[in-house]
């Protein structure tokens, strides 16, 4: 849809890499959608630091995510109804549908939690769900995953379903970014027997 690329084996100050999406994913661009034009170049200035020790000016390299993904995570939805939104492709209207459902349920007084399980790191969609009325939200990036695959998608979904059903909301809604047959792991998620059994409804957006 836009750009695809890879992570360089190493970077140094002064190197030029590319901005691969509006969520700030950086890397070496391998292919370009002609409709989008060339990606922006970004020159490496240094490493982003975080300061985990209160009162100490000791910086350590920042990492994506505040949790480490457990590939052996066990699914527990705590009896909460689950609605999944999938699509035939990108830009099929999944987020718009999710936001409309969240808004309507919130209008009826229901507590709704929402998350995005697959895709490339970009908080825009879950922020839109929050704006629509979701009480809590999450995205796969919170677990250190910048781009999902079939290898990470099922474990991410189990983990987020378990976390987002804690506190017993009335319903959890989650979006599966990209298409069912795309490279981001949607097919693997929907094919997982335990995840499939946990779903109350699946809504398909077609384009």
Features from the language model and the residues they span:
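N-terminal pre-Walker A segment at the start of P-loop NTPase domains
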Residues: 46-69
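Conserved Switch II/interswitch segment of TRAFAC-class P-loop GTPases
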Residues: 179-181, 198-207
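A short, gly/pro- and small-residue-rich
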Residues: 7-17, 188-200
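ATP-dependent carboxylate-amine ligase catalytic core
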Residues: 106-194
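Conserved active-site and cofactor/substrate-binding residues in soluble primary-metabolism enzymes
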Residues: 20, 24, 80-83, 92-96, ...
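Walker A (P-loop) phosphate-binding motif
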Residues: 62-120
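Structural motif
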Residues: 84, 171-173, 203-205
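Long, basic/Gly/Ser/Thr-rich N-terminal segments
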Residues: 1-47
């Amino acid at each position: 849809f836009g750009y695809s690329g890879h992570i360089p084996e190493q970077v140094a100050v002064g190197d030029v890499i590319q901005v691969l999406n509006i969520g700030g994913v950086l890397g070496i661009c391998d292919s370009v959608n002609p409709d989008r034009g060339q990606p922006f170049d970004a020159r490496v200035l240094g490493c982003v630091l975080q300061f985990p020790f209160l009162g100490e000016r000791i910086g350590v390299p920042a990492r994506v995510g505040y949790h480490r993904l457990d590939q052996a995570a066990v699914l527990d939805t705590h009896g909460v109804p689950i609605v999944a939104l999938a699509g035939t492709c990108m830009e099929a209207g999944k987020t718009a549908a999710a936001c409309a459902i969240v808004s309507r349920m919130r209008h009826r007084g229901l507590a709704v939690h929402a998350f995005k399980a697959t895709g490339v790191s970009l908080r825009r969609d879950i922020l839109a769900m929050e704006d629509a009325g979701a009480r809590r939200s999450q995205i796969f990036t919170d677990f250190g995953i910048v781009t999902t695959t079939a290898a990470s998608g099922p474990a991410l979904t189990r983990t987020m379903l378990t976390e987002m059903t804690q506190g017993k909301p009335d319903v959890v809604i989650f979006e599966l970014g990209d298409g069912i047959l795309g490279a981001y792991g949607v097919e693997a998620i929907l094919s997982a027997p335990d995840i499939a059994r946990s779903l109350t409804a699946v809504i398909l957006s077609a384009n």
